[in-house]
Amino acid sequence: MLCLGLSGRLSRVYENSFDLPNSFMHNGAAVRVRDGRVIAAVEEERPNRIKHSNTLPIRSIQYCLASAGVQLSDIDRIAYYATEAYCNAVLERVRLSHPSTPVSDARLLQRARGGRHGLYIPVGHPDVPCDRHRHTDLAAHWTRDGTMPWRLSPALHRRDELENVGPGIDC
């Protein structure tokens, strides 16, 4: 199984489209894992040369894919370090403080931002159902208002693998 893990905000370098708190997007990074073993991992500050870069890890993703000679469509699972509920809560907070913010839904934001780079993955599409990730020690996050449950990380799974993962959640 080939997996790609991501962290970082959804803005490009030198772009701050959405005024998100720093707790929402720590340093941008990508990691490629095959059958439970880390094969490639790159923090976005390395390829873009901006210390503590928390941007969408485009170059890191490109490296992780190119180093294996694979395309995004070859990836079995993609994980992000925060739950959809947490992302939506942060985006709603931003929208309330800045009414001109165009998007307050994580899926729509991912479609708008990721699609520009050929990284859009149709969450909720029948071929890409959503399930809670069970190995969550890597994503032990919390918020003061309790919008994000401890140690939860979403992971996208292909439909034929869900039997091995357990019950899914409605995405």
Swiss-Prot record:
Listed GO molecular functions?
catalytic activity
Family annotation (Gene3D superfamilies): 3.30.420.40
Q: Which InterPro entries match?
A: Carbtransf_dom, NodU/CmcH_Carbamoyltrnsfr
One GO biological process term is: biosynthetic process
Q: Which domain of life is it from?
A: Bacteria
Q: What is this protein called?
A: Uncharacterized 19.2 kDa protein in syrM 5'region
Which lineage?
A: Bacteria, Pseudomonadati, Pseudomonadota, Alphaproteobacteria, Hyphomicrobiales
